[in-house]
Amino acid sequence: MSTAGDDAVGVPPACGGRSDAVGVPQLARESGAMRDQDCSGELLRSPTHNGHLLVGALKRHQNKPVLFLGDTRLTGGQLADRISQYIQAFEALGAGTGVAVGLLSLNRPEVLMIIGAGQARGYRRTALHPLGSLADHAYVLNDAGISSLIIDPNPMFVERALALLEQVDSLQQILTIGPVPDALKHVAVDLSAEAAKYQPQPLVAADLPPDQVIGLTYTGGTTGKPKGVIGTAQSIATMTSIQLAEWEWPANPRFLMCTPLSHAGAAFFTPTVIKGGEMIVLAKFDPAEVLRIIEEQRITATMLVPSMLYALLDHPDSHTRDLSSLETVYYGASAINPVRLAEAIRRFGPIFAQYYGQSEAPMVITYLAKGDHDEKRLTSCGRPTLFARVALLDEHGKPVKQGEVGEICVSGPLLAGGYWNLPDETSRTFKDGWLHTGDLAREDSDGFYYIVDRVKDMIVTGGFNVFPREVEDVVAEHPAVAQVCVVGAPDEKWGEAVTAVVVLRSNAARDEPAIEAMTAEIQAAVKQRKGSVQAPKRVVVVDSLPLTGLGKPDKKAVRARFWEGAGRAVG
C-alpha cells in the first residue's frame, strides 16, 4: 500500500484549507483573512462544522457498527479509516482541495464515504440527481465548473458520462466507484481501487471558515432555470445542530436510507452517526423492498417524500409485514395529502414527523412533531425553529397579523451563501435582512404555520387571488381522489380558471357519469369550504402526475399542458 506520510488526514497545510471559489456572491465570498492573519486568533472562536461533528462521532462510536456495506458491518473506526483513504485518493487524483467535483450515483454505502471525505476536508461537491436529464446534468456541470465526475459505473451512468465529456468543457476525468468499464478506459480511474492503495490515517477535520463553500445544490427547476445554491460550512452545521436539538430521534436509530443520497437523504448521515445509530442503504426506493427491510432489519427510522409514503400505503405488504419496530418516519420535500397522512397514521401509528425547508435554508425552518399530528393540524408544516429568526412578512416587509397570509422569511446562520454566479438573483431573494422563501403561510394561535402556496403558484381569477394548496386540501378529501394538483388554466372570461387535475384511486369508478358526479361533488365541497371563487371550473382526470427528479408534483409541467398555444404564459 502507498502511504501519505505521518500527517493526520484532514489537517490543512495552513489554517485556511480553503477551496477556490469563483463567482461567489458577497454573502459567501472567498477571503484571505484566515491565511493572512495569525491563525490561532482566527480559530479561537471559529464554530465547528459538519466535518468536526462527523469525525468526533465516528471516534466516539469507533467500536460500534454504524454502516452496512454489503453483507458486512463497518464500525465507526472502520468507516473513519475508509474516509481517510478516500481523502488521500482525492488529493492524489486532483479531485480534492481547490477543485469542483460532481457526483452521479444511485444509493450505495460508498457514497457516504465520499460525502464524509467532503465534510471532513471541506471539499466543494455538486450532486447530480440520478433521474435528471442530459441537458440538466450538462447545465449543472458547466455552471459549477466541474473538473471531475464521480459515477456509479452502471450502464446508464457510463453512457451519461460519455455524453457529458462531449458537452462540458471543464470536465477532465471520470472517477468510478468500482471497476472502470471498457467504454471509459481512456478517461476514467477506479476511485475505490485507488483509495484502497493507501494506509488509513487518523481522521481529523480541517479547520474551515464559516463561509467556506462546501457544495452547490441546484434547485429543481420547477420555477425556471436551475440555480446553484451555495452551501457553506456554517449553513450545513446549523442545519445538523437543529436536527439534533429539535427533532425526535429513536434511542437506538437503525436508519433506512431509501431516498437519494444525492439530495435530502445525505442530511441524515451525520445526525444518525452522532446518535450512535446504524445506517442501511438501499440503491433505490422500491415499496416491497422497503417494507421487507423494515421488518427484517428492525428499522426504527427512515425518511420519505409523500409520493413514497403513498406507494407504501398502496402496497399489499404494508398490511402483512411486521413494521412495529418503526418509531419515526420523517417526511417532507413537498406538500402531503392530509387524507393520506391520516390514513398512514391509522395504519402505522403516530410515528410521523414533518420538516420544512428549502435549499436556501435547508430542511429545518419548521418542524411538526409526532405528537402534533392531530386532525386539525395535518395541513400544518409545524412551528418555526428556535435557532433562526422566522417571520411572516407582507409585500412591504412588515409582519402580518396572526391568521393573515404572509411570506415565510428567514435570517440567521442557517442561510445558504446565495446563488452561484447570480448576484442579481441573490440580491432579489436575500434582501432587507431576510431570505424571502417565496412560500406563503398563515400562523394559528398556537404558533403553527400552514403553507397556503408558493407566491409563483398563486392563481389570479377574475381579479381574486386563489391559493392552489388550499383547494388541493379540500379536493384530496374526496374518496375517489388519490392525488391532486390545482393550477390556473387560461380562460377568456376569468383570465385564469381554477383547474383540478386528479389521479383516481385504484377502486374508483371511471365511467362518464361517475366522473361527472365526482366533479360536481368536488366543486360543491370547495365552494362550501373555501368559496365560489376557489371552486374548480374544471376537474381533469389523468393516469399520473408528472414528478420532478425529487419526487415533487411538477406544477410547471401540469400548467404547461393548458397554456401551450395560449399566446401568453403564467409562471
From Swiss-Prot:
Keyword list (alphabetical) reads: ATP-binding, Fatty acid metabolism, Ligase, Lipid metabolism, Nucleotide-binding
Q: What is its EC number?
A: 6.2.1.2, 6.2.1.3
The UniProt entry's sequence similarity note says: Belongs to the ATP-dependent AMP-binding enzyme family.
Q: Where is this region: Disordered?
A: 1-22
Q: Which GO terms describe its cellular component?
A: plasma membrane
PANTHER family in the record: LONG-CHAIN-FATTY-ACID--COA LIGASE (PTHR43767), MEDIUM_LONG-CHAIN-FATTY-ACID--COA LIGASE FADD8 (PTHR43767:SF7)
Under the heading InterPro entries, the entry gives: AMP-bd_C, AMP-bd_C_sf, AMP-binding_CS, AMP-dep_synth/lig_dom, ANL_N_sf, ATP-dep_AMP-bd_enzyme
Alphabetically, the GO molecular function entries are: ATP binding; long-chain fatty acid-CoA ligase activity; medium-chain fatty acid-CoA ligase activity
Q: Which Pfam families match?
A: AMP-binding, AMP-binding_C
Q: What is this protein called?
A: Medium/long-chain-fatty-acid--CoA ligase FadD8
Q: In which pathway does it act?
A: Lipid metabolism; fatty acid metabolism
Highest taxon of source: Bacteria
Gene coding for it: fadD8
User: Reaction catalysed by this chain?
Assistant: a medium-chain fatty acid + ATP + CoA = a medium-chain fatty acyl-CoA + AMP + diphosphate; a long-chain fatty acid + ATP + CoA = a long-chain fatty acyl-CoA + AMP + diphosphate; hexanoate + ATP + CoA = hexanoyl-CoA + AMP + diphosphate; dodecanoate + ATP + CoA = dodecanoyl-CoA + AMP + diphosphate
The record describes the protein's role as: Catalyzes the activation of medium/long-chain fatty acids as acyl-coenzyme A (acyl-CoA).
